[in-house]
């Protein structure tokens, strides 16, 4: 193969675990070209490359963001393969506002 595979299933669910009720799911493939059902596959792949596949960097909160402290958890997951490496990632945000305040748009769908 000329390139390492990068194919992921991304989900957003209501609840505080990866097994939370999934509300939305998309596919994202970044090699050989960005594709899948993600609404902005090109940008999502570019952000993943820039973060070197480190999903924790993608879920960090933008500076200057203000959200209420309500506990209404939203969990995002990424499973599949990134540049040939197996991925099984999940992150729980305190509420939908915190999820929307993430630096990256990888989980914006």
UniProtKB/Swiss-Prot annotation:
Cysteine pairs bridged by disulfides in the record: 30-45, 67-97
Name of a matching Pfam family: SSI
Keywords: Disulfide bond, Protease inhibitor, Secreted, Serine protease inhibitor
Chief subcellular location: secreted
InterPro entries reported for this sequence: Prot_inh_I16_SSI (IPR000691), Prot_inh_SSI_I16_CS (IPR020054), Subtilisin_inhibitor (IPR023549), Subtilisin_inhibitor-like_sf (IPR036819)
GO MF annotations, alphabetized: serine-type endopeptidase inhibitor activity
One GO cellular component term: extracellular region
Site (Reactive bond): 69-70
Subcellular localization(s) per the UniProt record: Secreted
Source superkingdom: Bacteria
Family designation: Belongs to the protease inhibitor I16 (SSI) family.
Subunit structure: Homodimer.
Listed name of the protein: Protease inhibitor SIL-V2
Organism, as annotated: Streptomyces orinoci
């Amino acid at each position: 193969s000329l390139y390492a595979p990068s194919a992921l299933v991304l989900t957003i669910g209501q609840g505080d675990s990866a097994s939370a009720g999934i509300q939305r799911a998309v596919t994202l493939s970044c090699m050989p070209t960005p594709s899948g059902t993600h609404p902005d596959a090109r940008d999502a792949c570019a952000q993943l490359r820039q973060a070197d596949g480190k999903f924790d960097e993608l879920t960090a909160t933008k500076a200057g963001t203000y959200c209420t402290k309500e506990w209404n958890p939203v969990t995002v997951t990424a499973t599949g393969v990134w540049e040939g490496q197996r991925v099984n990632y999940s992150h729980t945000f305190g509420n939908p506002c915190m999820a929307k305040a993430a630096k990256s748009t990888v989980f914006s769908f």
